[in-house]
Amino acid sequence: GLQQKNDHIWVHNCDFFYGDAGSDADQVKGDGALDTKTSTYVTHSYNHFWDNGKCNLQGMKSESTENYITYHHNWYDHSDSRHPRIRTCSVHIYNNYYDGNAKYGVGVTMGASAFVENNYFRNCNYPMLISKQGSDDLSGGTFSGENGGVIKACGNYITGAKAYTTYQQDPTGFDAYEVSNAKETVPSSVKAKQGGTTYNNFDTSSVMYSYTADSPEEAKEKVMARAGRVDGGDLKWTFDNSVDDASYAVNEALKAAIVAYKDSIVAIGSGFTDNNDPVVTTVTTSVKSTTTTVTTTQPQQTTTTTTSTVPVVGSDVIYVSPNGGGDGKSMNSPTDVLTAIKSVPAGGTIYLLDGTYKFSETILIKENNSGTAGKYKTISAYPGAKVKFDFSGQAVAGANRGFVLDGAYWHFYGFEIANAGDNGMLLSGDNNIIEMMIFNGNQDTGLQLSRYNTSYASVAEWPTNNLIKNCTSKNNCDDATMENADGFAAKLTCGEGNVFDGCMSYNNS
C-alpha cells in the first residue's frame, strides 16, 4: 500500500491475490490489498483483484485534508469489500467492474465525498454504502460506527444488488445522491445522517481533470480485456458465479493454485537473474558463426550435446580486459578499453572480457567518434562475462561522470556502470542504443539524457533518437543531500525521439 505522504502516483495493471492471514476473523484472505493513506493525486487503474477480502482502504482517521484519488477500470473479481472504503478523501470512482461482490462496493465515512460514475455492478450485494444510514443500517453497520459522508452517483449499471436507495427515494436513509448529468452539483441541503457533512462537489470544481467516461457496458468489456497483467497474466482461473458471488470464504482451490504457482520470468530489464548477472545474448557482428557444436553418442545412452564458444576474430573485433596491454586481436592478447574505444571502426565490436574495470576519470566518447546508420560501434560484455566499470576512484563532483557518450550510433550492451562521482552515464549523442545495462550506486542519476557541449543552444543540437532498452538503474544516491539522484533522467536539454523501453528504476534517492 501507499502508506504516508505520497503524491502523484499511478498504480496500474497489477494482479492482487490473497495475502497472509491476519489475526482477525475478517483477515483470513489477508488485509488491505492496495491501501492508500495520507496521499494525494493518486490513480489506481486497470488492476485485477482476485477474491480479495479487503481491496482498497482509502484514508486514515487522522487525515484532515481533501486528498484527491481516482479509481478507474479496475476489476473487482469476486472480492468482498472496500472497493474502496473511504475516510475524509475526495474520490472519483468510474468505469470499474464489480463482479460478484459478497459484501459491498463503495463505502464512505468521516465526511468523505465520492463520485461514483458509470460503473458496472453485477451481483454486488450493496453497491454503495454511507456509514450509519440507508443500506448500512439494514446490514447492521459496516464501518465501526464512524460518521458518514456523501456519495454522488451517475450512470451506473446495477443488477443483482440486495439493496440500493437513492436520495430521491429516501432523503434521510439514502445510499447515494443520484444525478442524471455528471456536471450536476449536489446541493448543500444533502447531508450525511450521522455527522451532518455535505458533498464538496470536487468533481465540478477547478481541481477536476479532463476525462471521458465509457458507458458501463464498454467499461466492463475493457476491464475484462485489459485489467491486470498482459493477457491476463500466466495464472488462469474461472470463478463459479453460482457459488463465489455470495461467498466471502477463502476459495481453497484458488488458494492452492496461488500457493503452487511458479513464475516463468527469466529477467526483468537487466540485473534480475538468479545470480544477478546481466542477461546476455550474442551481439551480431559481420563475423561469421562464433560457435561449434560437438555431438557424442554412446550405445544405449542418451545423446549428449555440448556447445563451446569459439573466440571471434577479425579486423572489426577488439578484445579488452581490465589490465589489457596486447593488440586486442584475440582473447589471449586483449588491449585496454580506452585504446579500443579510439580505434574501433564503424560496424566493429569491442568485447569486454570478464572482470572489474577501475577508473578514476571519465571515459569520454567524443562527438566525432561515431558509427553510421548501418554500422554501429558496439561495446559489449563478452557472452557470459560479468563486467563492471567501477568509478569509485572519482571524487564526488558534477563533472565526474562515468561514461560520457557524445558520439552517435554506438551500442552499449550488457554490463554495469557503478560508483561514479556524478552520473553513471551522460548520454548526449544521437541515435545510440543503450541495452541491458545496469547503473548502480552512482552519486547522481544513473543515466542522464542531456547535452554535453554547453554551447549547444537549440533542440536540434541536443541528444535525439536514442533508445534506452531493458536497462536497470538502482541505488543511485548523492550522499550530501540524499535527494538529487534519479534512476533515469531526460533533462531540459534533451532533444526529440528518445525512447525508454522496458527499463526498471528502484531505490534511488
Model-derived features: positions:
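Parallel beta-helix/beta-solenoid
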Residues: Q3-N6, V11, K29, T38-S39, ...
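Feature marks extracellular polysaccharide-active and adherence modules
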Residues: Q3, H12, F17, K37, ...
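Extracellular mucin-like PTS domains
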Residues: T281-T309
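Extracellular beta-strand/beta-solenoid scaffold signature
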Residues: G1-Q3, S23-T36, D51-E63, H78-R82, ...
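Long, contiguous C-terminal flanking segments immediately downstream of a protein's structured core
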Residues: F121-T282
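Acidic Gly/Asp/Thr-rich repetitive segments characteristic of extracellular carbohydrate-active
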Residues: D316-I365
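Right-handed parallel beta-helix/beta-spiral solenoid domain characteristic of secreted/periplasmic
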Residues: G1, N332-T335, S370-N423, C477
